[in-house]
C-alpha cells in the first residue's frame, strides 16, 4: 500500500497543542473589516480548537502530523 499524503493546505492552517488537540484560526479577518465591531475583530484574532465533528476528517487529511 502506498504512503498516505499529507494535505498541504490543511497542514499550513492547523497546529497541534501539547495535549493533542487541533488548533485553527477563525475565518473572516482578512478584509471588509470596517463594518465589523472592535469586539468582533478582537475575537476573530483568537485561536480555537477544531470542533469534534471535524476531528476525524482532519486526522485523515493529516496522517503524520
UniProtKB/Swiss-Prot annotation:
GO terms for cellular component: large ribosomal subunit. Signal peptide: none annotated. HAMAP family: Ribosomal_bL35 (MF_00514). Belongs to the bacterial ribosomal protein bL35 family. Gene3D superfamilies: 4.10.410.60. This is Large ribosomal subunit protein bL35. The keyword Glycoprotein does not apply. It comes from the Bacteria. GO terms for biological process: translation. GO terms for molecular function: structural constituent of ribosome. Keywords: Ribonucleoprotein, Ribosomal protein. Pfam families: Ribosomal_L35p. InterPro entries: Ribosomal_bL35, Ribosomal_bL35-like, Ribosomal_bL35_CS, Ribosomal_bL35_sf.
Amino acid at each position: 500500500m502506498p504512503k498516505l499524503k499529507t494535505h498541504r493546505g490543511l497542514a499550513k492552517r492547523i497546529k497541534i497543542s501539547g495535549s493533542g488537540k487541533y488548533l485553527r484560526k477563525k475565518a473572516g479577518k482578512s478584509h471588509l473589516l470596517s463594518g465589523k465591531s472592535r469586539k468582533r475583530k478582537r475575537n476573530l484574532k483568537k485561536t480555537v480548537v477544531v470542533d469534534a465533528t471535524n476531528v476525524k476528517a482532519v486526522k485523515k487529511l493529516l496522517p503524520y502530523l
